[in-house]
Amino acid sequence: MSHAVIPTGRRIAPGQVLAGGGVCLLALAVLSLMVGPVWIAPSQVLGALWHPDPLNVSHILVTSTRLSRTLIAIVVGAGLAVAGALMQVLTRNPLASPGLFGINAGAMFFLIVCVSLFPKVAMSVWLWSAFAGAAVAGCLVWLIGTMGKGSLNPLRMVLAGAAITAMFAAFSQAMLVVNQEGLDTVLFWLAGSVADRELATVLPLMGYCLAALVGALLLSGQVNVLNAGEAIARGLGQRTGRIRLLMSLLVVALAGGAVAMAGSIGFVGLIVPHMARKLLPADHRWLLPGCALLGACLLLLADILARVVIVPQEVPVGVMTALFGAPFFIFLLRRGGRYG
């Protein structure tokens, strides 16, 4: 009597993985609306979303603070994760992250300049100044990385990113020595947080990030070809220089918008692509949506834990992602960067 052999080690279908990620994201989003110094029942959360009562304290808490930080965490986590996946293809380095473009340092310097020169302006001006700094740093790294033969050299770009980061960090330290008043604001921003952001203030930046996410998904086919190798991509008639330029612009838009909204949040762009590769095939048409879902889930989870670790105070979400990411990064280094 013959027995059917059930194959082991079979991957779950990519569609099922993405569906599961969507369910997890929805569950974490609802939990994020519930959790805090004051816990809110699920029925109250649903009531606040569908029929908000301006006299109900729980409804006010959900709509005024928790909804905005939940949406920001979703967009920022997805943006950083997709930017990290693109960056690893762009540099052909499995340990690359969006920080290689000097985005964090550029955003920090421009923010310090804005706080020092215009301390009384609205927070939206600070956010846009940080986004501008991220864009300037990314453009400088790109220009230096394409010097010489006119094509992007991954090694030159990494070195340029380190140099630009060091330069902006030195400028930032000099500005803080001259002007101590902006130190508290900058330290809060450096720690990384999705709290105390009004939805109306960050909505334009969220729109840019969402548009860049759509652009990354549309470019996923070309990313696959480039990931196969420069020679193969050229042999297939692909304009690799244009693909790299578009990928770089998307990285700057995604990571720059995320940094401007939430500050410096590390490790999401590094560890999420590796997690996604363990669950999904090496096809960026599946991998990039998976990174977006996993990144959003990871940052939401980190933000939820940040609220309950030392109630009634909160731990900056950037600290929580560092606690998750640092051991994972050490693990990747021990594996020689060949994880996944």
Swiss-Prot record:
Highest rank taxon of the organism: Bacteria
Recorded topology in the membrane: Multi-pass membrane protein
Compartments reported by the entry: Cell inner membrane
Chief subcellular location: membrane
Keywords, ordered alphabetically: Cell inner membrane, Cell membrane, Ion transport, Iron, Iron transport, Membrane, Transmembrane, Transmembrane helix, Transport
Classification via Pfam families: FecCD
InterPro entries: ABC_BtuC-like, ABC_transptr_permease_BtuC
GO molecular function terms listed in the Swiss-Prot or TrEMBL record: transmembrane transporter activity
UniProt entry tagged with the keyword Transport: yes
GO annotation terms (biological process): achromobactin transport; chrysobactin biosynthetic process; siderophore-dependent iron import into cell
Its biological purpose: Part of the binding-protein-dependent transport system CbrABCD for uptake of the siderophore achromobactin. Probably responsible for the translocation of the substrate across the membrane.
Family that this chain belongs to: Belongs to the binding-protein-dependent transport system permease family. FecCD subfamily.
Protein name: Achromobactin transport system permease protein CbrB
UniProt organism field: Dickeya dadantii (strain 3937) (Erwinia chrysanthemi (strain 3937))
Lineage of producing organism: Bacteria, Pseudomonadati, Pseudomonadota, Gammaproteobacteria, Enterobacterales
